[in-house]
Amino acid sequence: MEEKQREKVVVIIGPTAVGKTKLSIELAKALNGEIVSGDSMQIYRTMDIGTAKVTADEMEGIPHYMIDIKDPEDSFSVAEFQELVRGHIREITKRGKLPIIVGGTGLYIQSVLYDYQFTDEAGDTAYRERMEKLAEEQGVEFVHKKLEEVDPESAKRIHANNVRRVIRALEIFQTTGKKMSEQLEKQKNELLYDVVLIGLTMDRTMLYDRINLRVDLMMEQGLEQEVKRLYQNGVRDCQSIQAIGYKELYRYFAGATSLEEAISQLKTNSRRYAKRQLTWFRNKMDVAWFDVTDGEKTAEILRYIEGKLQLKSNNN
């Protein structure tokens, strides 16, 4: 029997502020592509400035998916992300287009490309309800500490406010005796798609300068007002507000810090996150890195993708 041809996928990764959005639009135009956001925070409506969401003008008519699909109060799991993005890959491919995933959330992107299993076969409704009650009565930190005791790796990865996922990890351990973190690590080395992983990097000093500048620009664009609306609307203890740009300003609105200190912390956290992103991708995935310190490398990257996926661009 002839082996089913794997779907072609391009993935663009790299730290925040390195230029992924601009490159993705150029590649989509050249390769007849459509774009899927791989950022776990761009899914939230009304959280536009702080998540550096692509604007309608920037899209240049290229369809984008996985943006504005949840309210800030909603939780969102890696398993949901995996299912939705794989669906978009199928649909985009069926239309004869090339799926281009753009983003910086490493685990989420990895869960799509590799054979990560998030099965629902392990379930214990009574236990789940008991944990939900405990979270209500004793607080989310109490339940999170229980997870720390049995699966410290998952506890590190899952924020206490993401109660549903904390309880899911506890439930998996309760019913199977296996840690969720171990199950996530068990993946096939083989990619599910015919994929090209493009990574953008640049001189660290220049990158950090760009990140600082981006934060200043976000403040000019109204980030303070965007976060204030969420705060005044009573959005609390949610997964969404753990995003960089939101948690720092929440502390300001709660009276725990000055605006100046909050902005400084936001810059620091953004730089640290960029460093973690680079480290994660270098350690976990087979990425073709392109240094854009001296300017964009669109033509070079395009040639590389054409060669790897045996595609012809509209630029030829």
UniProtKB/Swiss-Prot annotation:
Site (Interaction with substrate tRNA): 105, 128
Residues binding ATP: 14-21
Catalytic activities: adenosine(37) in tRNA + dimethylallyl diphosphate = N(6)-dimethylallyladenosine(37) in tRNA + diphosphate
Enzyme class: transferase
The entry's keywords: ATP-binding, Magnesium, Nucleotide-binding, Transferase, tRNA processing
GO biological process terms on file: tRNA modification
EC numbers for this chain: 2.5.1.75
A GO MF term: tRNA dimethylallyltransferase activity
Record: residues binding substrate: 16-21
Annotated region (Interaction with substrate tRNA), positions in chain: 39-42
KW tRNA processing (keyword) present: yes
Cofactor: Mg(2+)
Segments traversing the membrane: none
Domain of life: Bacteria
Pfam families per record: IPPT
Function text: Catalyzes the transfer of a dimethylallyl group onto the adenine at position 37 in tRNAs that read codons beginning with uridine, leading to the formation of N6-(dimethylallyl)adenosine (i(6)A).
Entry-linked HAMAP family: IPP_trans (MF_00185)
Quaternary structure and interacting proteins, as annotated: Monomer.
Family designation: Belongs to the IPP transferase family.
Protein name, entry field: tRNA dimethylallyltransferase
Provenance organism: Bacillus cytotoxicus (strain DSM 22905 / CIP 110041 / 391-98 / NVH 391-98)
